[in-house]
Every structure is written in C-alpha cells, then in structure tokens.
Amino acid sequence: RGSLSNTIIGKNTFLDNQVHIAHNNKIGNNCIIAGQVGFAGSSSIGDNVIIGGQAGIAGHLRIGNNIQIGGGSGVIKDVPDNSKVMGYPAKDLRYFIKDNK
C-alpha cells in the first residue's frame, strides 16, 4: 500500500534489474522493462509496452498500449498507442532516424 496512492504492476510484466518505479505509477499487463529504467511518479503505462535499458520516463505522463521505447530515451511527453519512440527527448522513430542520418 502506497502512502499517496498504490503503485500497480500488471500481470505478466517483466522487470529487469535496477528498475526504479516511483509512487502512484500504473504499469499494464505483458510489459517488458529492461535494466536501469527509471519512472518518475504518477505515470500510466499501457499494456504490451517494451522499454529499452536506461530509458527515463518523466512524471505525470500517459504511455499508451503497444509502445516500444528505445534504450537510453528520455520520455517527457505522452506517447499515443501503437508508437515507437527513441532519443532524448523521445520522438517518433521515423523522425529520429531522419534527424540522425
């Protein structure tokens, strides 16, 4: 039981080593979270989300369903369903590749 609100981790969600999850977070079902990922407080992570190692999720965000977040990314705004994002700040993978050619 959390002091502010409960942090909830869904069924079949895998957390690797050194993952930091702050208060009031809700992580959906069937997610894979690689090592050294950090979640600030009060964010909502949907179902079927994959987060690469050393990514950071800012507080008070909504990460949709069926999302892929690249390793080392810094997510500072909401991510809509069925997206692939990468970089710092995290942006749609198509734009990340175009900007880093």
Please tell me what each predicted stretch does.
Residues 97-101:
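Long, leucine- and charge-enriched amphipathic alpha-helices
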Residues 1-92:
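Structural signal for interior beta-strand "rungs" in well-ordered beta-sheet cores
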